[in-house]
């Protein structure tokens, strides 16, 4: 059975959680793509401001998200997929990257408790790197997620991204579908099972003028 889903970001307000989940259910949706990335946004990560969100004891973090799980259950909704905070890795910032790995593992743990089967981990776009260097950087990043993906029974999904510079949009990592398929195949081979998949963002593809059929 196909399920109709909507992202939590923009649909559920923190000051009135129940209204958000009720309206989603009344609109006919079956599930919610939960945006952990709205609780730990990119600018917060780059400013190394992550301790108050996902770098706490897991039970303390769970208290923040438990109301979401309870209200979703009340209205017959599930969290089939989640979006993890990003970027997971930033070149040249090893200390920040270590914190983000721990924050990501905690995020995976909470996603598992909420019933997610898929979690989107955005690839990293490197402006000043050659295409093969960017590919290798992302492959190494995703390989580091294998153990936690297995532990929390999550399929890690890449996503097709766009990037912006000087008011122009460009293809980001993941937008070359053939390249993404090759990367996913290599990651699954390394994992020994299907732990990696793809979240196709039609909006991102439309912004870049992609041919949907192709």
Language model features with spans:
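N-terminal pre-domain/capping segments
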Residues: 1-117, 150, 185, 189, ...
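Acidic/histidine-rich catalytic cores of soluble enzymes
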Residues: 3, 32, 133, 144-214
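Active-site-proximal loop/turn and secondary-structure-junction residues that shape catalytic pockets
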Residues: 10-12, 36-40, 85-88, 123-127, ...
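A structural signal for well-ordered alpha-helical scaffolds and beta->alpha junctions
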Residues: 17, 65, 104, 142, ...
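A short acidic, helix-capping loop that chelates divalent metal ions and anchors anionic groups
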Residues: 42-44, 88-94, 127-131, 164-170
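Glycine-rich, often proline-containing surface loops adjacent to acidic residues and nearby aromatics
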Residues: 83, 118-122, 157
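Short, amphipathic alpha-helical segments
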Residues: 94, 98-101, 132-139, 171-178
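Hydrophobic alpha-helical segments and helix pairs
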Residues: 107-143, 149
């Amino acid at each position: 059975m196909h399920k109709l889903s909507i992202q939590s970001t923009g649909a559920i307000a923190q000051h009135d959680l129940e209204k958000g989940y009720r309206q989603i259910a009344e609109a006919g949706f079956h599930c919610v793509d939960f945006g952990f990335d709205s609780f730990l946004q990119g600018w917060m990560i780059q400013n190394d401001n992550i301790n108050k969100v996902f770098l706490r004891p897991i039970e303390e973090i769970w208290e923040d998200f438990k109301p979401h799980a309870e209200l979703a259950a009340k209205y017959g909704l599930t969290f089939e997929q989640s979006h993890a905070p990003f970027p997971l890795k930033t070149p040249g910032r090893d200390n920040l990257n270590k914190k983000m790995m721990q924050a990501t593992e905690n995020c995976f743990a909470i996603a598992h408790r909420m019933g997610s089967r898929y979690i989107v981990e955005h690839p990293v776009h490197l402006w000043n790197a050659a295409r093969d260097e960017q590919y290798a950087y992302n492959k190494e990043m995703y390989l580091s997620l294998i153990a936690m993906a297995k532990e929390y029974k999550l399929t890690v999904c890449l996503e097709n991204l766009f990037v912006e510079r000087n008011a122009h949009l460009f293809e980001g990592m993941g937008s070359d579908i053939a390249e993404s398929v090759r990367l996913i195949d290599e990651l699954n081979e390394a994992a020994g099972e299907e732990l990696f998949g793809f979240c196709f963002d039609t909006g991102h593809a439309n912004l870049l003028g992609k041919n949907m059929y192709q």
